[in-house]
Amino acid sequence: MSFFAGKLNNKSILSLRRGSGGDTNQHINPDSQTIFHSDMSHVIITETHSTGLRLDQGAGDYYWSEMPSRVTQLHNNDPNRVVLTEIEFSDGSRHMLSGMSMGVGAKAYGIINPQIMSQGGLKTQITASADLSLDVGYFNTGTSGTIPQKLRDGTGCQHMFGAFSGRRGFASSAMYLGGAALYKSAWSGSGYVVADAGTLTIPSDYVRHPGARNFGFNAIYVRGRSCNRVLYGMEGPNYTTGGAVQGASSSGALNFTYNPSNPESPKYSVGFARADPTNYAYWESMGDPNDSANGPIGIYSEHLGIYPSKITWYVTNLVYNGSGYNIDGGLFNGNDIKLSPREFIIKGVNVNNTSWKFINFIEKNFNVGNRADFRDVGCNLSKDSPSTGISGIATFGLPTTESNNAPSIKGGNVGGLHANVVSIYNFLPSASWYVSSNPPKIGNNYGDVWSENLLPLRLLGGSGSTILSGNIVFQGNGSVHVGTVGLDLNSSRNGAIVCTMEFIDDTWLSAGGIGCFNPTEMLSQGAEYGDSRFRIGGNTINKKLHQILSLPAGEYVPFFTIKGTVVNACKLQAAAYNPTPYWVSGLPGSVGQTGYYTLTYYMRNDGNNNISIWLDSSMSNIIGMKACLPNIKLIIQRLT
């Protein structure tokens, strides 16, 4: 029999299982065929908080709101609590935040004969978002200025790194020395770079990760766009004589340094700052950003065709413990069991009168329809291969559900995607209940609530984890396997998981591909192996992103994407940086040799009880893509 309500082995049980027939005793304990069981550690929503978004004058397209006080308290003081964040848009569609994205721009610039005249340098700018497809971040309303200016000290900032030498002879040497000071290593035995005592180390608390929890943020912003991709023109960082970058956060750092053992050696400056995400003039001479030869910079993000209007936070009873998850408090601790048209009591809890909400896993291609008690929310994408299918500029659409609960995808240019949803079930006092054994289901006058297609999430089995760390070099477009998590997933069915991306340190900034490595290190000079990342000191900031994901069997779910642009730049026609930056194929030549790339991390339900992790590289006009894995501890536990 597929349904039981009563007592077995002297304990109260309500149980719904797949199949029909069989011994009543199979309901005593839940197993892999269980749909609902009153003894299971079900995942529920204990609190719901909502606020509308507004758009201030001068805020561009940065919609924002202060977070409710309870959400602010959880965000800053309870970083292990799994809180789901839903964004509702002007057309009624909905999206649940998941994953992370970065935008990276990098440039090396100089002239064909740097021993004679002009400038040289290198520069990187990084933005990041607390969602794979949408630009989302946190800030403090107490910061001065407009909303974009407030983001200089929030997670919506741009992190700016640069090394620069002015109009003087032998600028080439200064470029090399500046690169050595800014990055962790320089060429080995190349004859160009020597060890230098002047180095720039960025303190960890200068960095604003999208999952940062220690800065007292009390507000959130959302754009109807993807995370910024930074497109560079030809000029270089323009430092002021006062030793600070104009328009940047006061928390920035700027070092003017040189080789102290040789005062006559070429001088150079090395800098870091956080800045407004919408105004990049402070490190560039401004002009037409669409002029590839002389334009200073472009800020490009893909509009998804919708505008955010409301945010809802769902506080769950799931708590991350560093190696897995716990359920906070018991759900059903009484004895009474009753299921009748007007009453639904599970071990003393009358669910019709509770404020709890259950979270259901919905099978792929199943739609509950437009119902008052179900609120489906698009949570993640999936596809048949770990590849964007796009060379260079790839953008993932936004998984949403429409106001009638139908799944959809907004914007993007990556094809072959499926939108997956999580379903929020709200018990209504007006519900009239029924139960069926064949097929097994519990429902009410609004429709089925729990069935083989509608599984209430519950914490199952042990957790699994892997750490994504190290260097990878791609010689062309392709995907590589970077990790496996064993979870004892049911091999024949789709599943749902809870997943935490815990960033062990701030080397995630170096995960931005070639844009985050020293551009004066050519591939032929050993850049395949050299550790040439930014120096970040300390790890004082808690950085976690929690999400619930749907994993269709055999499909790949993107959870972290990096969009990059690199430019080999010079202001003079028919001149180029010398030597050639390591990402460029060939000798110096044309102005503005620009390359584009997208790095994407996927997880796959392998159908053999494992989840595999993949990294895909998509490049255009780039050779030798060098990537640093972001030093993420990825913790996953089954919910179905």
UniProtKB/Swiss-Prot annotation:
Superkingdom per UniProt: Viruses
* Gene Ontology biological process terms in this record: entry receptor-mediated virion attachment to host cell; receptor-mediated virion attachment to host cell; symbiont entry into host cell
Keyword annotations for this protein?
A: Host-virus interaction, Late protein, Viral attachment to host cell, Viral attachment to host entry receptor, Viral tail protein, Virion, Virus entry into host cell
Compartments annotated for it: namely: Virion
- For the site labelled Interaction with host FhuA receptor, the residues are 166
Statement: the UniProt record of this protein carries the keyword Transmembrane helix: no
Q: Please give the function described in this protein's UniProt entry.
A: Structural component of the distal part of the tail. Mediates T5 irreversible binding to its host entry receptor, the E.coli outer membrane ferrichrome transporter FhuA protein. Upon binding to host FhuA, pb5 undergoes conformational changes that are probably the key to the transmission of the signal through the tail to the capsid, triggering DNA release.
This chain's protein is named Receptor-binding protein pb5
Q: Which organism is it from?
A: Escherichia phage T5
Taxonomy-wise, where does this protein's organism fall, top ranks first? Viruses, Duplodnaviria, Heunggongvirae, Uroviricota, Caudoviricetes
Q: Which gene encodes it?
A: oad
